[in-house]
UniProtKB/Swiss-Prot annotation:
Belongs to the TRAFAC class translation factor GTPase superfamily. Classic translation factor GTPase family. LepA subfamily. It is an enzyme of class 3 (hydrolase). GO terms for biological process: positive regulation of translation. Its main location: membrane. GO terms for molecular function: GTP binding; GTPase activity; guanosine tetraphosphate binding; ribosome binding; translation elongation factor activity. InterPro entries: EF-4, EFG_III/V, EFG_V-like, EFTu-like_2, G_TR_CS, LepA_C_sf, LepA_CTD, LepA_IV. The gene is lepA. This is Elongation factor 4. It comes from the Bacteria. The keyword Cell inner membrane applies. PROSITE patterns: G_TR_1, G_TR_2. Residues 2-184 form the tr-type G domain. It comes from Shewanella denitrificans (strain OS217 / ATCC BAA-1090 / DSM 15013).
Length: 596
């Protein structure tokens, strides 16, 4: 066991985690040169296209160190984006150490900090690595000082490497062997294995990635899942090198996969413990804290007969994505669908894209909302994540909105722009620290503002240099109201949104104008109104198409024309009573794209 090293790679987006993992695989000969592709571990098409890591992946490599021993390195490549921080904490639970990769040109960014603190809280040894030293703008000395200053770990002697050209990769491997401690565990104790991740394979059933803490898991043995008490047979066990490689057993300290033909989707939940069916361990390992979704949106299949497939797809996806939450929902405008809870907007985009690609579904999403705490006049507290569930205004005592603490790292020259943006988003500043050229500012912001388009706006006001990391801290009372859109006097539930009273006039007008462009003209007038309670705050009318009924009259008495026009008017009136307006797909999406 003393020759095993378990570690994960943490870094900010685009600091070169996936490229570094490619190099480690290549140096240790995990794949032949022919099989090497850039970003081997980003196996989803979506990951490659966007150039981001979404799912953590594990690999086992053998490294012949300079001290003459062969070490087994198990490493897990983790995502860097703030929406996927739960993936990072899951990966870290399986490790004894972490490589903190920092771009020698850009320096420390907010996400580097957040992930690094997560690792230090779990008592992992953090080894700093300065990447991209081949770039002309690299300043390893300055960045090393920045790491010591901001993160607070010793970094003057940090390894310098360039994952792209391969300089210094051997030194990184030597550092891992020297600085990261071997796993602690007892091979003779009863089996305890932590499920780090699982996914559904059409042929094999559920495949689980496990870290063996104590004991040995042999091929063909019976094991049980501790939370459900169900017993299964370990048909295949093995490791990823990144290819699957079957083994006869997995020993304490190792990371590998178990395939046991589990067909039901939630047979082996992530964070659960496996043990032997006979003479098993008494208590499970501490799992992961369940993450609470921050953003909710209604998602509906475009054709209603897809509903069953949609449900199956969500079940399969939630196995692989432990943070996904969903419950059935119906809407008078869109039919049957689900209310899905996400960790943030990027997560929402990725989930929708994965559903559409991997399961061939056509979906439509309503505007995302956060969870509000509503105090009723009778003293009850209810949590509302859907605007149409908001109780009537006269029953509400006050509404509390979720507040996040946002840590923003930004170069000095863009500080003014960032502060202006935060004030516009109703933020209050709580802290500001200068670290050399970087400034760390902390703001308390309403989550609803952060979720909509804050990240994009932050990047554009700072030319992409600012970085953001946020977490929920509390609920604060706020003057929130529900903005309804009425079409010919009928509420369209899928277009409702909860917003701050100061924004309603501006938001209402913009929405009504947008709807006017998108709803096709009918044979009768369509009134589009934005309302708060019973008060109408904006209105626009789509004029009716009309046929020129008097075209056949020429000359003669005006009363003949009047008669025809009045007859047309009567017809339009009747039509308006029975006619209903189809709201096109684009109208629902317009709500999402409505920038302030």
């Amino acid at each position: 066991m003393k020759h095993i090293r378990n570690f994960s790679i943490i870094a900010h987006i685009d600091h070169g985690k996936s490229t570094l993992s490619d190099r480690l695989i290549q140096v240790c000969g995990g794949l032949s040169d022919r099989e090497m592709a850039a970003q081997v571990l980003d196996s989803m098409d979506l990951e490659r296209e966007r150039g981001i890591t979404i799912k953590a992946q594990s690999v086992t490599l053998d490294y012949h160190a300079k001290d003459g021993n062969t070490y087994q390195l198990n490493f897990i490549d983790t995502p860097g984006h703030v929406d996927f921080s739960y993936e990072v904490s899951r990966s870290l639970a399986a490790c004894e150490g972490a490589l903190l990769v920092v771009d020698a040109g850009q320096g420390v960014e907010a996400q580097t900090l957040a992930n690094c603190y997560t690792a230090l809280e779990m008592n992992l040894d953090v080894v700093p690595v300065l990447n991209k030293i081949d770039l002309p703008q690299a300043e390893p000395e300055r960045v090393a000082l920045e790491i010591e200053d901001i993160v607070g770990i010793e970094a003057i002697n940090a390894v310098r490497c360039s994952a792209k050209t391969g300089i210094g990769v051997e030194d990184v491997l030597e550092e891992i062997v020297a600085k990261i401690p071997p796993p602690v565990g007892d091979e003779t104790a009863p089996l305890q294995a932590l499920i780090i991740d699982s996914w559904f394979d059409a042929y094999l059933g559920v495949v689980s990635l496990v870290r063996i803490k104590h004991g040995v898991l042999k091929k063909g043995e019976k094991f049980k899942v501790m939370s459900t008490g169900q017993n299964y047979n370990a048909d295949r066990v093995g490791i990823f090198t990144p290819k699957e490689k079957d083994k006869l057993e997995l020993r304490a300290g190792e990371v590998g996969y178990v395939i046991s033909g589990i067909k039901e989707i939630h047979g082996a939940p992530v964070g659960d413990t496996l043990t032997h069916a006979k003479h098993g361990a008494d208590k499970p390992l501490p799992g992961f804290k369940k993450v609470k979704p921050q953003v909710y949106a209604g998602v509906f299949p475009i054709s209603t007969d897809e509903y069953e497939n949609f449900r199956d797809a969500l079940n399969k996806l939630s196995l692989n994505d432990a943070s996904l939450f969903f419950e059935p929902e119906t809407s008078s405008a869109l039919g049957f669908g689900f209310r899905i809870g996400y960790l943030g907007l990027l997560h929402m985009e990725i989930v929708q894209e994965r559903l559409e690609r991997e399961y061939n579904l056509d979906l439509i999403t309503t505007a995302p909302t956060v969870v509000y705490e509503v105090v009723m006049t009778n003293g009850d507290i209810v949590y509302v994540d859907n605007p149409s569930d908001l109780p009537a205004l006269n029953n509400i005592d006050e509404i509390h909105e979720p507040i996040v603490e946002a840590n923003i790292l930004v170069p000095k020259e863009y500080l003014g722009n960032v502060i202006t943006l935060c004030i516009e988003k109703r933020g209050s500043q709580t802290n500001m620290v200068y670290h050399g050229n970087q400034v760390a500012v902390t703001y308390h912001l309403p989550m609803a503002e952060v979720v909509m388009d804050f990240f994009d706006r932050l990047k554009s006001t700072s030319r992409g240099y600012a970085s953001l990391e946020y977490n929920f801290i509390r609920f604060d009372p706020a003057d929130m109201v529900r903005l309804d859109i009425l079409i010919n006097g009928d509420r369209v539930d899928a277009l409702a949104m909860i917003i701050h009273r100061s924004n309603i006039r501006h938001r209402g007008l913009a929405l009504v104008e947008k709807m006017k462009e998108l709803i096709p003209r009918q044979m009768f007038d369509i009134a589009i109104q934005a309302a708060v309670g019973s008060q109408i705050i904006a209105r626009s009318t789509i004029k009716a198409l009309r046929k020129d009924v008097t075209a056949k009259c020429y000359g003669g008495d005006v009363s003949r024309k009047k008669k025809l026009l009045n007859k047309q008017k009567e017809g339009k009136k009747r039509m308006k009573q029975v006619g209903n307006v189809e709201v096109p797909q684009e109208a629902f999406l317009a709500v999402l794209k409505l920038n302030d």
